Amino acid sequence: KNRKVDKAEIKKRTDEFLNLMQIMQYADRMPNQLSGGQQQRIALARALVISPDVLLMDEPLSNLDAKLRVEMRSVIRHTQKSVGITTVYVTHDQEEAMAISDRIAVMKDGVIQHVGTPRDIYQRPKNVFVATFIGRTNIVNAHVKDGIITFADGYHEHIDALDKAAEQDVRCSIRPEEFIICKDGTD
């Protein structure tokens, strides 16, 4: 109404988003008659009806139980894709960020540490904070010289990508799934 849109258009767009969110059957219920997930879907549908250029979602799933959070992640991701509205999604939940986002900005003390795709942030973190914030990792000290990385125990490996790297001490992030167990004497 405040946007000077006629009632028929409001009804049409409201129904469109209620259907998209799979909550048409709850359209006439009062908030106290809805579950937490239904309330979240209604709130999202209301926000989408006005066709914003950008949608800000600040911890939208923080008050939901674990099962409902997973379900709502899927609903939000599907809605983002089908509607095509740029969404800024604020969360402290790394799993939620990785599941919903096309691009992620990881912040520490109000300073952006890394912006990238979920895969980029996970596999090529810009610093130790980002590496340890997203997923599990092992941080080990090493030294790089002439394309060879040498660890504290003396183990070393030539890595082509390090051929042009300046000699320096480094910290390596090694994800648990990257470890391969071999029998003694095998490479």
Place the predicted regions along the sequence by residue:
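ABC ATPase nucleotide-binding domains
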Residues: 1-129
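Generic, ordered loop/turn and secondary-structure boundary motif
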Residues: 27, 134-135, 160, 180
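Short helix-capping and hinge/turn segments at secondary-structure transitions, especially at repeat
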Residues: 106, 126-127, 135, 139, ...
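Short secondary-structure boundary/capping segments
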Residues: 79-80, 141, 162-163
